[in-house]
């Protein structure tokens, strides 16, 4: 393993989209009370990819990925690989359609985290490095102080945000019906140690989200960008 892969994000106990191998943080409120400020971002429906000085990685960091849907990202990496140093950029690769089709994508890769050795960088630093390498970040939904927050208020806010359509427009790939966003990711707005990841990042996923199967990689489809949708309408 060249570098450590992205940690497993635990679900909120009220997240309905858990699967058999998912983990739930039943003591999430104890963790959140140790955090000063939370940032809630949209959970995008794609593949977790990492850009580091050693290559482009998918979930496994045993070896760089060579999948066809990362070709464009690997070409981009060639341009920035010598400038990354110890910084590892993590983002959602939306090049291939999964269980949600987005209609307003301006690009296919959105940054959600950055790591430097044993430290996960603050949200401000994530945005700084994303901008430095001319990469967009995932949609920021809300930043809020934990002071005055209660478990019930947090739950209501997370569920409310999860029931909205995606920032980039979301529909079911097969029926083309408008659907809600995949979910919401909450994280400590500050920096924290890699070993403390599970106590600083939490997620909520919509019920029955995953609709792809083991044959997905054989029949994958490229996600159109917004200007391609616009061209289709004009024609």
Regions found by a protein language model. Name each.
Residues 1-235:
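Core nucleotide-handling region used for phosphoryl-transfer chemistry
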């Amino acid at each position: 393993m060249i570098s450590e892969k992205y940690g497993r994000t635990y679900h909120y106990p009220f997240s309905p989209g858990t699967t058999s191998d998912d983990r739930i943080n039943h003591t999430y409120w104890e963790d959140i009370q140790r955090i000063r400020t939370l940032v809630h971002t949209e959970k995008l429906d794609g593949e977790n990819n990492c850009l580091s000085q050693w290559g482009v990685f998918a979930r496994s960091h045993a070896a760089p990925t060579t999948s066809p849907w990362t070709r464009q990202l690997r070409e981009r990496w060639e341009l920035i690989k010598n400038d990354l140093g110890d910084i590892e950029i993590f983002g959602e690769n939306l090049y291939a359609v999964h269980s949600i089709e987005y209609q307003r994508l301006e690009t296919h890769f959105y940054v959600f985290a950055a790591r430097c050795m044993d430290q996960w960088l603050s949200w401000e630093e994530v945005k700084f490095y994303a901008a430095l390498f001319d990469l967009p970040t995932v949609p920021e939904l809300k930043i809020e102080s934990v002071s005055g927050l209660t478990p019930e208020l947090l739950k209501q806010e997370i569920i409310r945000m999860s029931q909205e359509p995606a920032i980039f427009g979301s529909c079911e790939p097969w029926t083309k019906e408008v659907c809600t966003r995949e979910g919401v990711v909450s994280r400590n707005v500050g920096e924290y140690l890699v070993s403390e990841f599970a106590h600083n990042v939490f997620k909520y996923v919509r019920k029955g989200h995953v609709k792809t199967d083991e044959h997905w990689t054989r029949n994958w489809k490229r996600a159109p960008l917004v200007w391609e949708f616009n061209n289709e309408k004009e024609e």
